[in-house]
Amino acid sequence: MSVRGGGAPLLDAVLAGRACCAEETVDAEPAGLFPEEEALVARAVPGRRREFATARLCARRALAALGAAPAPLLRGRRGAPAWPAGVIGSITHCAGFRGAAVAPADRVLALGIDAEPHAPLPRGVLGAVAFGPERARLRVLAARRSDICWDRLLFSAKESVYKAWSGYGGAWLGFEDAEASWLLDGTAEGPRARVPGQGEEHRLGGRGRPPVPRAPARAGGGAGAHGGRSGVAAGRFRVRILVPPPPVRPDGFAFPQVLHGRWLVRDGLLLTAVTVPRTALPRPIPTAPKEPF
């Protein structure tokens, strides 16, 4: 289920019905916040207060679709929203877009969403978010579809993965700790793909990671409001975690080493989402061997 201020729901397209989501392109007034939430942004500039209020409004609408009663949504570990018990969720915002997605914790282990302007990353940032094989794949993909900002897509995919990882309880994850590949129009670019010149990816923060400037938020939909390239494209991506996963939970569920997600480019925006269904059980809890008689 999804709701939106107007037009087709973008988040629902990348979540594929696995979560309740809500999104807005016009900012709300902070008057809709609970007092506890207002205190979190009491010293923020007006634009940040409106951005915060709209994202919280989206979260409440998505939670209402799950049957949750309205309540303050405060900050938890690492500044991410502290979702109600029994709920997994994620929030995202960029210029001209605010969104939230939630799912029952008994059906989804982890969830991450990210929205970005569909525009190239600032100069010098790609080297901090992608390593050699990924950059080689980006060059191949750019030759095939130059209308897609593949560098921004890589950044966004890893952002979604980090939100899912962090929400699950994982330790710090750097950009260099995850490797991304993509699927578009039936053509995959993955770790085994042949690349010319080769023998045969609150957010992710790699060590020494430079900040990625974001365009000033302003209301209104459409490509002009986001300052990015227009057009429509969609596909899937895969991200392989290169560090040990969080410990297996007592109920036997474990965070997978490989995550699969969806991406969408539309109206000057780029969106990505990752969900880890609770059916994912890559490894059971080891049991102690029985003592011999």
Where are these regions (language model features)?
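Core catalytic alpha/beta fold that binds nucleotide/phospho-ligands
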Residues: 1-293
